[in-house]
Amino acid sequence: MIETPSAAIISDLLAKEVDFFSIGTNDLTGYTMAVDRGNAAVSKLYDPIQPAVLRLIETTIKNAKKAGIPVGMCGEAAADTRLIPLLCKWGLDEFSVTPSSILHTRKSICECE
């Protein structure tokens, strides 16, 4: 599970030791941006579209691809239609989303193809 910035940064090394990656975007975003999404005073800063978060996600996906292992994503970002085109472009293999997000996520993925 890639949930911390440090794990994403060394994902090239971790990829040699595991069979797959799952990127946990809720924690990855929170730890990267140093915000608690449940804290109203700072929750507006919680956004997986921030460049630092995007770079960590892209790095992790690219390192998984180089190592020949599948990579999936869970958390709110997996269903974020602003992010799905990038995830498709980078080669994300699996999107794990809530049941209420399946249809719009599937539609967004189909629009990428």
Give the label of every model feature segment.
Residues 1-113:
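Conserved alpha/beta-domain cores
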